[in-house]
Amino acid sequence: DALGTGNAQKQQDINHLLDKIYEPTKYPDLKEIAENFNPLGDTSIYNDHGAAVETLMKELNDHRLLEQRHWYSLFNTRQRKEALMLFAVLNQCKEWYCFRSNAAYFRERMNEGEFVYALYVSVIHSKLGDGIVLPPLYQITPHMFTNSEVIDKAYSAKMTQKQGTFNVSFTGTKKNREQRVAYFGEDIGMNIHHVTWHMDFPFWWEDSYGYHLDRKGELFFWVHHQLTARFDFERLSNWLDPVDELHWDRIIREGFAPLTSYKYGGEFPVRPDNIHFEDVDGVAHVHDLEITESRIHEAIDHGYITDSDGHTIDIRQPKGIELLGDIIESSKYSSNVQYYGSLHNTAHVMLGRQGDPHGKFNLPPGVMEHFETATRDPSFFRLHKYMDNIFKKHTDSFPPYTHDNLEFSGMVVNGVAIDGELITFFDEFQYSLINAVDSGENIEDVEINARVHRLNHKEFTYKITMSNNNDGERLATFRIFLCPIEDNNGITLTLDEARWFCIELDKFFQKVPKGPETIERSSKDSSVTVPDMPSFQSLKEQADNAVNGGHDLDLSAYERSCGIPDRMLLPKSKPEGMEFNLYVAVTDGDKDTEGHNGGHDYGGTHAQCGVHGEAYPDNRPLGYPLERRIPDERVIDGVSNIKHVVVKIVHHLEHHD
């Protein structure tokens, strides 16, 4: 930062801004700024000379902004517009003083949900946010992640001044088969991955905000494809068939009772079982979505889309899936939003509103209208299976890979082994609910925690033995997938049937010296996953200690919270164990990374979340080499640089260290 503001100070400021978000700030320095700072006082502190802040101040002074203590949804057009006005202001700040002052000022004046969203995306996308770790959202807005019963207990603990730790149970009862896999969709780490991915790659993003989000449309496909495939793996582990796709003209079989409440706005609406889709006032008619879908199918059949100027763009080429992802999600990158609509975003709102489609009961938005809560609803995965099948139709239109396409000449994978057993178990995790309850003037905060059960696994290491028969060292890309062998009825799947259900476990780049070599890779280094984020309490302590001690703070290991949680890398499996195929494909790293600058140690979570502000580090299609049809699996088995072995995953009901 030009003013030399260190990471420790920035981290402390962000911590203070997000503390007790529904109450006036308790920090004297922020209070003083909020009362005395004039956002329009000196417009030289903004890159746009104050244009963005002028717009927001006009809305504020004309009393047009959403009031505080009201629900907020990103899918609500007006509310999103307001949050993005604040994002635009923070994004135009030249220095931290400007960022912090505006944040402190608008925190006291704007809707809390809009403020939190704008602050999070600003820290993620602004250069000023580098080095800051955003606290886990489940501690900032706990209502979105914790059921009402536990929140009520937290309130009574606060009132009676008794410390407490309360168990969060998964939604539903044993009468509901879907409850068997609730631990996946309701996992707070998985919720954070989903909401953060959509903050890293927002559908509202325009390049005028500062840079281009590389392969955003393709990543939209791949991240949701992987979430759906992982959900199907968990279903397989619980004796359930893969999730069915959604149909606009058939009933929605599974209802959903979220049993969670907004901080302000009442309970999340319930959707009963077996209802037909209804038109939603002010959103869309069911028929509109059917038309949108048929236009997308038509584009895939023709092999081209039509842009808003009437020109055709070929999609039977490597960038085709990117263009398709942009029009299906409908991000601002869509080539023709007028014609292709906004299938994904509209469908989220349609599903969210089925409990009150005509606004008769004035219910707040449903869980599907928030990325934080969407994966809790079984219909989320049905919706994404439906979209996934549209993408599959596109990828199936490409010719299968040939031996020459797949071969990495001179590179032989001789064997793949796992060092250690593949064991999964459930463990317990606690998070603080202090931000869920209001502070009274004379009531001290007491320690109140929620305790959740989370899927975890023992760490393991891949051992890949290989021979590099080329005349020197070669850069290689290692692509590791886990694939089902049988379906839920015990019928063996062909590779062509299984490939679409495979989950990505890792993708990394490594130099392989000439001759025989053994590559070892720990499961915790996976580029698909992220470690547990530090708690809000820990972030506050670390930042305060650093600021008070006058030293800096390096939290770079936690800067990205986009990624599958480390502990959920493996599917749960069954107590008696399940066998899966582990595929390792080693491809030519020089070709894969051609045109990318810098080293090849892309730590973090580049596989599904890219590299922040840079081009995606791998030129191959996401999912390569399993993303295209495989009519003859001998082609895959016939290349020396791809190997698969059978591995067994066992679920331990008791957790043994």
UniProtKB/Swiss-Prot annotation:
GO molecular function, one term: oxygen carrier activity
Region (Disordered): 594-616
Presence of keyword Hydrolase: no
Positions with a binding annotation for Cu cation A: 194, 198, 224
Alphabetical keyword list: Copper, Disulfide bond, Glycoprotein, Metal-binding, Oxygen transport, Secreted, Transport
Glycosylation site residues: 167
Residues where Cu cation B binds: 344, 348, 384
Gene3D superfamilies, A to Z: Di-copper center containing domain from catechol oxidase, Hemocyanin, C-terminal domain, Hemocyanin, N-terminal domain
InterPro entries cross-referenced by the UniProt entry: Di-copper_centre_dom_sf (IPR008922), Hemocyanin/hexamerin (IPR013788), Hemocyanin/hexamerin_mid_dom (IPR000896), Hemocyanin_C (IPR005203), Hemocyanin_C_sf (IPR037020), Hemocyanin_N (IPR005204), Hemocyanin_N_sf (IPR036697), Ig_E-set (IPR014756)
Cysteine pairings via disulfide bonds: 93-98, 483-502, 562-609
Tissue expression notes: Hemolymph.
GO cellular component: extracellular region
Cellular compartments annotated: Secreted, Extracellular space
Chief place where the protein resides: secreted
Other information: The A chain contains two copper-binding sites. Three histidine residues are ligands to each copper ion.
Subunit structure: Hexamer of a number of different chains, of which A, B, and C have been identified.
Functional description taken from the UniProt entry: Hemocyanins are copper-containing oxygen carriers occurring freely dissolved in the hemolymph of many mollusks and arthropods.
PANTHER family linked: FAT-BODY PROTEIN 1-RELATED, LARVAL STORAGE PROTEIN/PHENOLOXIDASE
Similarity-based family: Belongs to the tyrosinase family. Hemocyanin subfamily.
Protein name per the record: Hemocyanin A chain
Organism: Panulirus interruptus (California spiny lobster)
